[in-house]
Amino acid sequence: MTPACPLLLSVILSLRLATAFDPAPSACSALASGVLYGAFSLQDLFPTIASGCSWTLENPDPTKYSLYLRFNRQEQVCTHFAPRLLPLDHYLVNFTCLRPGPEEATARAESEVGRPEEEEEEAAAAASGLELCGGSGPFTFLHFDKNFVQLCLSAEPSEAPRLLAPAALAFRFVEVLLINNNNSSQFTCGVLCRWSEECGRAAGRACGFAQPGCSCPGEAGANPATTTSPGPPVAHTLSNALVPGGPAPPAEADLHSGSSNDLFTTEMRYGEEPEEEPKVKTQWPRSADEPGLYMAQTGDPAAEEWSPWSVCSLTCGQGLQVRTRSCVSSPYGTLCSGPLRETRPCNNSATCPVHGVWEEWGSWSLCSRSCGRGSRSRMRTCVPPQHGGKACEGPELQTKLCSMAACPVEGQWLEWGPWGPCSSSCANGTQQRSRKCSVAGPAWATCAGALTDTRECSNLDCPATDGKWGPWNAWSLCSKTCDTGWQRRFRMCQASGTQGYPCEGTGEEVKPCSEKRCPAFHEMCRDEYVMLMTWKRAAAGEIIYNKCPPNASGSASRRCLLSAQGVAYWGLPSFARCISHEYRYLYLSLREHLAKGQRMLAGEGMSQVVRSLQELLARRTYYSGDLLFSVDILRNVTDTFKRATYVPSADDVQRFFQVVSFMVDSENKDKWDDAQQVSPGSVHLLRVVEDFIHLVGDALKAFQSSLIVTDNLVISIQREPISAVSSDITFPMRGRRGMKDWVRHSEDRLFLPKEVLSLSSPGKPATPGAATAGSPGRGRGPGTVPPGPGHAHQRLLPADPEESSSYFVIGAVLYRTLGLILPPPRPPLAVTSRVMTVTVRPPTQPPAEPLITVELSYIINGTTDPHCASWDYSRADTNSGDWNTESCQTLETQAAHTRCQCQHLSTFAVLAQPPKDLTLELAGAPSVPLVIGCAVSCMALLTLLAIYAAFWRFIKSERSIILLNFCLSILASNILILVGQSRVLSKGVCTMTAAFLHFFFLSSFCWVLTEAWQSYLAVIGRMRTRLVRKRFLCLGWGLPALVVAVSVGFTRTKGYGTSSYCWLSLEGGLLYAFVGPAAVIVLVNMLIGIIVFNKLMARDGVSDKSKKQRAGSERCPWASLLLPCSACGAVPSPLLSSASARNAMASLWSSCVVLPLLALTWMSAVLAMTDRRSVLFQALFAVFNSAQGFVITAVHCFLRREVQDVVKCQMGVCRADESEDSPDSCKNGQLQILSDFEKDVDLACQTVLFKEVNTCNPSTITGTLSRLSLDEDEEPKSCLVGPEGGLSFSPLPGNILVPMAASPGLGEPPPPQETNPVYMCGEGGLRQLDLTWIRQSEPGSEGDYMVLPRRTLSLQPGGGGTAGEEAPRARPEGTPRRAAKTVAHTEGYPSFLSVEHSGLGLGPAYGSLQNPYGMTFQPPPPTPSARQVPEPGERSRTMPRTVPGSTMKLGSLERKKLRYSDLDFEKVMHTRKRHSELYHELNQKFHTFDRYRSQSSAKEKPSPPGGRPGLSQHRRHQSWSTFKSMTLGSLPPKPRERLALHRTAAWEPTEPPDGDFQTEV
């Protein structure tokens, strides 16, 4: 070896160590991984040289690699540090290597109590380690197959690093080599050979060892004494050169592999080189920097020669060929470059044979026997081999035993009786004997076997004179399998003598058989397909077995039952032997965790199992067999936690008890009843919970307690020292944070005095009475607890008596529903209270007198004769225990709870006789009162809906729409009430039914509130728009939907539907989600009703107008309006007609009657649904619900005036006071109803064209104006400004003023009077118009009608004059108001046209007209005016309906022809879509009168200012009819500003109206 090789190797190893070490947790311990070879010193391994420091080397795969170590002895290192090696399976961070002291050794011995002997020996060997300095030789060789090897400095004085020489610290005393056991490389074999060579040289004799795949050649010229086997000398072979070979010769000393640690200090010999065999080299040189990476080699390329390609790995199909090359460079020199192995694919044209393959096993067949032990089988098929492959190996049929339900006990035969006489007096005959069957009970079956026994008997031969009968043959099969059948047997007559006679008797015998009655057709259950399973036809009483559904494995059973009426029906299937695939997979995962050798890993695996089990049970979709399987999983988890050194975390404990809470939920009662037929799983669960409580309690500190709260159980665990129990124990603590409501409101209580816990006797077995719920075995020692049924292991309490008796672990559990699933007591008793469990370990000695006080509340009301009882595990008559009523005393019984006083700690409950009606099964259909009440209410409401649908076009209004929604909510509620009473609903359907029932109950209340709100808006005169109607819908349907959505979101549907009814649960406060909103709605409805009633009384109750104004609010500026403004939304007071008040009062009365009845109906419905046993609540609901339907129908249908009028007209009975041409008259029984638009047009035309005062009846005008409406299909058109500055006014008729005093003569000037302000509709709403700049206050005739043009007219000056007429000028700014008289009469006003009385030339008969107020009416003189009637040929105006005088008497047909003929009113349609177009056409007709006015205006054309002096007087007498429309652009700036409408600050405009202005509610 050259001097440069060790130097280069040391540099490479130092770099390797620098990167291979993992970051150490401290400077005193380090972990190295990925080291192939290295020689290390103290300075390399221990940066901080101190006692207890360690250096750990990792073996990447103990099954594939082995660690070889050589220790080079150095006296100073051995003296000061005493290094030793520890083989480890796991690496422990910051593990100290110091030898344990006496105290630590004792503690470690205590912690190892209970371990197997093998584990104790292994632990002792690991703790002591291997002393490296124990041998006498210079070298120590070690071989390890462990995961880790740790080098420790066990002893080191503080001054040792300063006393050691630097050479000793730098001395490489440890060499490490990692060898592949399957394929050793040349480098590793060379290192082993070098170690053997150096060992032989140092010892002075031959030294050798064997390694599979390596052999060391013999050195040339060696001493014959150093070799043990002859061989040819190898020339020019280096001592460290190694040729891979086969196994070493037997003469070599083997270095054994495995888990043993072998120490070699003796010399080793070289072996003989075997024959060279080709090997495939798969070892790449690994990098010295990163483990798992390969490093390129460098060296002489000429020394690298590839071997020939190997034979193809496969004889058929595509395989691989491999070739290798060897690196012959020195291990201490440069490394070779390039890979040592290459592969390439090789193709073979031969077809590979395909062996036969078994398919999946089929499903297991049914058990061969219906009871007892039978067998089940399954088969599989083999896919046939191909191309000469092998056939399938293994059985095709597989069988296993199966155990079904126990067979009925058969009776026992008594002894046989004596033989009877022989049947024949001569020759051969038969004898019979019989026996009796003893049946002990009615459930026993008959005896199996024959009742009689027959044998042949021999007599003397009969005389030959007569014939004789031969023997009887066997009885034939019965002719019927059921009912009475027949069996026959025959015998033959043997030949008689020549003088004899034939045989006497008959050769056939018949007897009845099969007296079992055949089931009738109605006593047979038919074939049924349920849950993906087919149940075949069976007779009543038979049990049919079937395979479980596809998502489970096992067998399901079902019994055919017989009802009280004698009709067969299928019972519920039993799935107690069905296990879901998910639960079975979880159990397999549990077995895998249990198979782990490491206890810590097994404990962590149990946490994962509990988490998975919680997720499965949270889905609530499992079979009864899954519950039993879950109990077994929890038992295994508890046992694993006990054996493992793993303390369950708080989350693990919470999940464990949450799983138990899911399992004992009341919804699983039927599943537990089904599972009890196979195994008492609820009792096993009770014991598992007690064991887990003590497991958690052992991990607690002294005086520490733990409280776990779930939906169905509350657990309290605390640990108290035996010597000083702090205080008495009271459970549960209702005031604790996070406690459930069912615990806070219950009266369950446990009082455990501390004297009971101070009576224990450590070291002595508890007396038979001291067995607690946690230690059910009575008469046993405290060290063991017998396992329950199915338990595979026994629990060993701590063996140390001081530790086991120094602390009490006290556990108390309050179960909410455990009494429903535990095995029931003997009838007629039943568990009628909650169940409470108290367990204490170590067990206490029972006191001399009862000191434990337990108070338990009832879960079933109406029970009698209560008894306190405890669960006794030692009852001999049952294998799991039973209730014992003798262990507790019943102190007092109250209406809500019972107080008990017991002597032993156990599981307590109250047993009593349930009420008789509780034993009756609830019917699957709703009760008769509920059906009657819902049916009557639905029929009444459907009648109302049918009537409204028939007359909808005549009675359509907001009130009707609200009523229809209200009826729909009540109908849906009645239907859901009937659906929710069915017991066949699933959990999801029941939850949805409860949620929708909650929604429709609230919506019915909300629609009553909506009706009250609509009444209030009608009374105050606010116009309803589409926005308001949308608010009605939001209140009626949106508010209930919001309440239900919030409730469902917060509760996650918990509480919506229970196992008894489909309604809100009475526990948990969810019922307030219905009671609270309903109460608020009733209160708000009452307040609105009071307000509406006060407003109606304040308006209709005061007769004097002045008092009414003083009593009311301040008069609004738009109160004088007789028409609504389409822009501001103001409604004038005349529109609030008496019909509005009447409708509002009717709506108010309806709310006052319907709302209380609605509240009583739903309250009785809730009581009837939640308590189905009470017939009183069901009867009350039927009465209230029926009355509610009749009242709603009567109020809104039979008593409603609109419906009555429509029905009368349909029947041909209308008002008799109307004329034949009345728009609402009926002819020949046919209804002639004019649209609202036609009525308005008719009234406007009569008022404008014929200025008859008597036709302008105020009541008629008010009634007509109250019917004004807009088209519902069109958006409202607000008042907009025209393109030229003009105003667009409402197309509806204008201001109609009723004369309040005597009308002056037509030729007399009207007396001066104060005119009402005029309002205009603009963009901003309603504004008052200033008219003082146009003229003085000159009122027109009170009968004048103001027409508002629909659209902007061409308001150009000088409309009626000649072409040369001057344009009018507006009044300049600052001109006084009286100067307005000088304004030319051709100046138009942009909004109104004044209409004078039309002169018709009626004659004297028209002169004595009286107005409605009794004043004499003088007709005006016939002067030429713009409103005069033209020539007879041009006369085509509409005549009034009733005109006094003979000259106006025309036939109805002529009047109809004359009516509106020139106005072309045939275009008037009943639809409202053409209202706008017809109004525009009507206004154009009105403005055609301007051409007649132009002639009179030309005659009286005014002169310019300064002209005739009588001009002002003439203009003073002009009326408003002389003004025409003009644009705002023609006005001066100042007058234009004065024309701007003023907005009153006392009121705010509303939104544009959309819909009718009807004030009907």
UniProtKB/Swiss-Prot annotation:
Region annotation GPS: where it falls in the sequence: 868-918
Sites of Phosphotyrosine modification: 1345
Disulfide feature: 312-346, 316-352, 327-336, 367-402, 371-407, 382-392, 422-457, 426-462, 437-447, 478-513, 482-518, 493-503, 525-560, 548-578, 868-900, 888-902
UniProt function note: Orphan G-protein coupled receptor involved in cell adhesion and probably in cell-cell interactions. Activates NFAT-signaling pathway, a transcription factor, via the G-protein GNAZ. Involved in angiogenesis inhibition.
This protein's name: Adhesion G protein-coupled receptor B2
Main location group: membrane
Mechanisms controlling activity: Receptor activity is regulated by proteolytic processing. The long N-terminal has a an inhibitory effect on the constitutive signaling activity. Removal of the N-terminal region induces an increase of the receptor activity.
Cytoplasmic-side segments: 952-959, 1010-1030, 1094-1115, 1169-1561
